[in-house]
Amino acid sequence: MKNTVKLEQFVALKEKDLQKIKGGEMRLSKFFRDFILQRKK
């Protein structure tokens, strides 16, 4: 469970960066979608 909390904090930080970085938005959003789908399994 500790890992889950750390991952959620990491994702939250990356989402803030994502808003700043428009160029890599498509690539990062795809990465997050795949990442979240993997966690649900």
From Swiss-Prot:
Keywords: Competence, Pheromone, Secreted. It comes from the Bacteria. GO terms for cellular component: extracellular region. Acts as a pheromone, induces cells to develop competence for genetic transformation. Disulfide bonds: none annotated. The gene is comC1. This is Competence-stimulating peptide type 1. One of its GO terms (biological process) is establishment of competence for transformation. Pfam families: ComC. InterPro entries: Competence_ComC. It is found in: Secreted. The keyword Flavoprotein does not apply. The keyword Secreted applies. Its main location: secreted. Belongs to the ComC family. Residues 1-24 form a propeptide. GO terms for molecular function: pheromone activity.
